[in-house]
């Protein structure tokens, strides 16, 4: 916002604010639960865990793993994993040093997740 008319427009958005109905709230909660059930790991892609001393691209590994969980499509994921993901950046190069976990603002179990990810994608 850099002008008064923009501020007025933004405030008008909430002039007729109404909270969600019980049915709308239930629908949002149901959708959130469904999405949460498909996500493999709650990585936001902030990249605070980077750089990895071994060259593992942690957020990109988690992104492809989450795509598998969210959309399925194992053949497409396998192709992306094998053809477009540099081997040097794959989870298999993790030596479990823990530097990434110390930096993660989400406090994710990155080392264990990378091992599960590699095992799951190797089985595609």
Residue ranges and their predicted role:
Residues 1-124:
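Structured C-terminal cap/extension of enzyme domains
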